[in-house]
């Protein structure tokens, strides 16, 4: 089989799928991408694409994302045409992330080739991540911008032969006419790598961090420290917890940036705002930045309690991975988390908007080792049953072969 995978970042959600197909000499796997990030995969040919220009300066802000998607779509089309000549590759099936436009025109160059679209999110001005906070009211400008932002998603929904998304919650965001027939297949996590290590001690030599003597470690992971992922609420919760417990440490993995939602006031960052507020023992709060996979593993294997908070938005890999590590989890009582976590069975749920409740749930777990062990064991069992990448790749493989019939 000639399999073409498309994502602007390599390998992203398609790591395990690419590895699976690349193992067989009967398959040829090509990954069309904008950014390799220095990564390579055995037996996977990487082909780059680059838009010819940036979106038009001064273009209406509503349509700037659509123009960027068109530019990406044109760039991938040119790369696909070039592949046929330069590396003699013509796909039997195409699978790609539809969010940035790279898949837009694949059916125009390969009308007979099945196109499978990975659909991550459909935007709404209310009843979702936007206007979720009680005092938030989207402006008319926000509403019009978000409606227009869905334009290239709608083109992809119409163009793809097969559609899938990772969670039921994400599926529920799409228009009803496209939900019908949309498959739910999570990419899964590596349960062999994300495994418990009872008694693990946390030492990050590259970060100069030695918590091998720490009795309690609270962990938090996010690509960016920002409101969408409950960073301000987490910081307020740990102020409460650290004020009561003098031997507890907190480790935060992620970058001082905003990936989603509103930017902080000009010249500031959300992390900087919390540091200015203070009110916590900075000697026991450790911002370790972005970590390599082995150090990330060390953090979660040594975690006493892991906290994951999110608005009603895309569910992060890190939450599923923390459960696979057997962490005792406190998650936000929001739809994407509730799809996975049953309060008191495989984790705790807390009110996102109430830091006092988050702190209470953290302390309930810190005070009860037997409860932590029970919830952590159940959390890993949940992942083994529903999010094991080996099973999810098989499910996705069946989807691919089904599309080719």
Regions found by a protein language model. Give the residues of each.
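Conserved acidic donor-binding segment of nucleotide-sugar-dependent glycosyltransferases
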Residues: 343-344, 348-355, 364-369
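Nucleotide-activated donor-binding/catalytic signature segment of Leloir-type glycosyltransferases, i.e.
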Residues: 254-258, 263-297
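Carbohydrate-associated surface elements
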Residues: 169, 188
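Acceptor-binding helix/loop patch of EC 2.4 sugar-transfer enzymes
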Residues: 53-63, 113-152, 192-201, 212, ...
């Amino acid at each position: 089989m000639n399999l073409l995978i498309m994502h602007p970042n390599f390998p992203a959600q398609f790591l395990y799928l690419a590895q699976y197909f690349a193992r067989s000499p009967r398959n040829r796997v090509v990954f069309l991408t904008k950014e390799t990030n220095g990564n390579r995969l055995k037996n996977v040919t990487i082909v780059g694409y680059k838009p010819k220009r940036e979106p038009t300066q001064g273009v209406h802000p509503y349509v700037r994302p659509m123009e960027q998607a068109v530019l990406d779509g044109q760039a991938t089309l040119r790369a696909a045409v070039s592949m046929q000549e330069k590396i003699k590759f013509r796909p039997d099936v195409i699978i790609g992330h539809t969010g940035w436009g790279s898949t837009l025109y694949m059916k125009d160059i390969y009308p007979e080739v099945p196109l499978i679209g990975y659909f991550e999110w459909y935007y709404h001005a209310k009843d979702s991540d936007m206007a979720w906070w009680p005092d938030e009211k989207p402006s008319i400008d926000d509403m019009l911008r978000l409606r227009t932002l869905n334009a290239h998603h709608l083109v992809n929904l119409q163009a793809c032969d097969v559609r899938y998304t990772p969670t039921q919650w994400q599926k529920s965001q799409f228009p009803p006419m496209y939900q019908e027939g949309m498959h739910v297949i999570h990419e899964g996590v590596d349960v062999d790598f994300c495994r418990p290590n009872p008694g693990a001690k946390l030492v990050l030599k590259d970060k100069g961090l030695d918590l091998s003597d720490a009795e309690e470690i609270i962990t938090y992971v996010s690509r960016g420290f920002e409101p969408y992922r409950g960073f301000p609420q987490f910081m307020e919760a740990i102020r409460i917890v650290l004020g009561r417990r003098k031997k507890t440490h907190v480790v935060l993995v992620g970058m001082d940036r905003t990936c989603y939602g509103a930017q902080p006031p000009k010249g500031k960052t959300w992390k900087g705002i919390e540091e200015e507020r203070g009110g916590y023992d900075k000697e026991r709060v450790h911002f370790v930045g972005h970590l390599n996979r082995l150090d990330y593993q060390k953090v979660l294997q040594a975690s006493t309690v892991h906290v994951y908070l999110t608005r009603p938005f895309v569910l992060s890999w890190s939450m599923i991975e923390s459960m696979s590590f057997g962490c005792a989890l406190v998650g936000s009582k929001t739809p994407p988390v509730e799809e996975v976590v049953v309060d008191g069975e495989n984790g705790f749920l807390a009110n996102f908007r109430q830091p006092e409740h988050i702190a209470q749930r953290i302390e309930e777990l810190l005070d009860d080792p037997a409860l932590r062990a029970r919830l952590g064991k159940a959390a890993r069992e949940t992942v083994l049953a529903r999010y094991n990448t080996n099973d999810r790749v098989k499910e996705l493989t069946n989807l691919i072969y089904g599309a080719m019939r």
